[in-house]
Amino acid sequence: RRQRQMCIRDRLYKEEEIGVFFDIGTNGELVIGNREFLLCGAGAAGPALEGGVVRTGMRASAGAVDKVYLRNGVFQSHVIGAEKACGICGSGIIDLIAELFLHGWIDFRGKLDPGKSPLIQRRDGMYAVKYAPGLFFYQEDIDEFIRTKAAAYTMVEYMLRESGISMEEIARFYVAGAFGKHVSKESAIVIGLYPDMDRDCLINVGNSSLAGAVRLLLDRRVLDDIEGILEKMVYIQFSAVDDFLHMMVAAQAIPHTDIKRYPSVWERLAPNLRQLF
């Protein structure tokens, strides 16, 4: 149902150019196609991306850190509601991990280097980085987040492979959901959640399900399109894909074990970080 609403919201099913529609919420729901075909699938990619499985994670509400910058060894952040930071939400996590990587505080595996800053401390048997007063982001949080972003990336990669489409053929990459609306495109590319592509082709569309439902209510002719959408849709069951886990393991690096897929990230890396690849 949600995937039909996604198609209705941005008329993917009527476009000549090929597009990708990725709704990141409790689950990751994906559609790739145009007016000729629609491949769709879903997988568990949402909880960590929304801050749900990290120790100090929270939804994007008052008190949540939603933007993070690392300047001269000091974290600067934006807190929703301009209140005291109580935790960190998905967009803040992506900024945090991207900044840690670009400044060499974590390596491509996401492992914290305690020699880089006194803000990286030993807590509860592992390293953690202090990103705000009294708030830490733990090594296990980073590891879980990398696994989750790898699953999301692999869903897109597999669908493109199955359809015989390259990233260069994608005209638009829509990201839906509250998470997609607020996340930094650059940070998401740095960590390997989004593919490295023209930023103008990455479009945040917000709550696509609600927008699709509103469009349906305002234009009953959309009902006539739904049967056509259903006829075009082919569902991919990721759990039944033999090499999905193998592909996901390859994506469990920042941004990816194959750094050639991320030329813009490579250009931003300091020489000592490039030596790690």
Predicted feature residues:
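Glycine-rich phosphate-binding loop of actin/hexokinase-like ATP-binding domains
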Residues: 13-92, 184-206
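Phosphate/ATP-binding catalytic cores across multiple sugar-kinase/actin-like superfamilies
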Residues: 146-168
